[in-house]
From Swiss-Prot:
Family that this chain belongs to: Belongs to the geminiviridae transcriptional activator protein family.
One MF term in the entry's GO annotations: zinc ion binding
Quaternary structure annotation from Swiss-Prot or TrEMBL: Monomer. Homodimer. Homooligomer. Self-interaction correlates with nuclear localization and efficient activation of transcription. Monomers suppress local silencing by interacting with and inactivating host adenosine kinase 2 (ADK2) in the cytoplasm. Interacts with and inhibits host SNF1 kinase. Binds to ssDNA. May interact with host RPS27A.
Subcellular localization: Host nucleus; Host cytoplasm
Region described as Transactivation: spans on this chain: 120-135
Name this protein carries in UniProt: Transcriptional activator protein
Transmembrane feature ranges: none
GO biological process, one term: symbiont-mediated suppression of host innate immune response
Zinc finger (unnamed): 37-54
Function text: Multifunctional protein that modulates host antiviral defenses and promotes host attractiveness to insect vectors. Acts as a suppressor of RNA-mediated gene silencing, also known as post-transcriptional gene silencing (PTGS), a mechanism of plant viral defense that limits the accumulation of viral RNAs. TrAP suppresses the host RNA silencing by inhibiting adenosine kinase 2 (ADK2), a kinase involved in a general methylation pathway. Also suppresses the host basal defense by interacting with and inhibiting SNF1 kinase, a key regulator of cell metabolism implicated in innate antiviral defense.
Extent of motif Nuclear localization signal: 17-32
Main location (coarse class): host cell
Domains (record comment): The zinc finger and the transactivation region are involved in PTGS suppression.
Amino acid sequence: MQSSSPSTSHCSQIPIKIQHHIAKKRQVRRRRVDLDCGCSYYIHLDCINHGFTHRGVHHCASSNEWRLYLRDNKSPIFHDNQTQSEPIQQQIQHTNIPNQIQPQLEEGTGDSQMFSQLPHLDDLTVSDWSFFKSL
């Protein structure tokens, strides 16, 4: 019996489990970068134009990013190597507070702010409460 499909190519599709198995074996293309602090990281080759901040120091991952940080005056190739090899320090925009934990307000037993404008809440009847519960 002939196939009713108009296609002349009758290849079977690869099962998804086999596709996943093949994808797991594929090498991830990435580059290792060692930092001055002793840490190292791997950067995927597709993410080469993205920098990151580590321990308050910004690290550039491409010459385009260097050009951005050097305000595009001239190509980073023409700058001295000391400027390029040193990571750019980010300025801290906040004041140093010794205790970074904010205290939580204690719960009070008085009226809450939301119900302070509603008078006579203690005078509600059972039918009033049942009406509110039905909403």
